[in-house]
């Protein structure tokens, strides 16, 4: 699964990791199911997000607001996020963009952090 993350500027890694543990427990998804973290380009150098990715051992992939906004589908909108980033939702859109699949767990928010999970398409070959 791909983890989509949005966060306020200056959010510590600990806040992201704490919310992630709660989010995964609520969704009954193992941490081992995560393959990457995705967000918006504005967060490419966000220290707390980079540190959280380092602790998790996962790569961070970011996308421009235009690429996230172009994704079709129902996403949980936020006028505030739209005013700051230029796209109405970062976590869900980034997760879907990074996975190429469908939203598995919708936006979960607390203390300036938003998380979402999307499933990568899987087609076994025999």
Report residues per predicted region.
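Conserved mixed alpha/beta catalytic, RNA-binding, or beta-rich assembly cores of soluble enzyme
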Residues: 1-43, 118
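Structural motif
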Residues: 1-3, 35-36, 61, 101-104, ...
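Fold-independent oxyanion-binding glycine-rich loops
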Residues: 5-8, 40-42, 64-65, 87, ...
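Alpha-helical scaffold segments in soluble metabolic enzymes
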Residues: 19, 51, 92-96
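Long, charge-dense
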Residues: 40, 49-89
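C-terminal edge-of-domain segments
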Residues: 92-126
């Amino acid at each position: 699964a791909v983890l989509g993350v949005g966060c306020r500027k200056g959010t510590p890694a600990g806040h992201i990791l704490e919310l992630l543990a709660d989010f995964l427990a609520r969704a009954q998804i193992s941490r081992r199911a995560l393959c990457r973290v995705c967000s918006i380009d504005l967060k490419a150098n966000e220290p707390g997000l980079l540190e959280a990715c380092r602790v998790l051992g996962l790569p961070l992939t970011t996308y421009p607001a235009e690429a996230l906004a172009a994704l079709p589908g129902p996403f949980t909108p936020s006028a505030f996020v739209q005013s700051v980033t230029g796209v109405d939702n970062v976590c869900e859109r980034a997760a879907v963009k990074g996975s190429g699949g469908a939203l598995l767990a919708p936006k979960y928010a607390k203390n300036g952090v938003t998380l979402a999970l999307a499933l990568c398409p899987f087609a076994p070959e025999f």
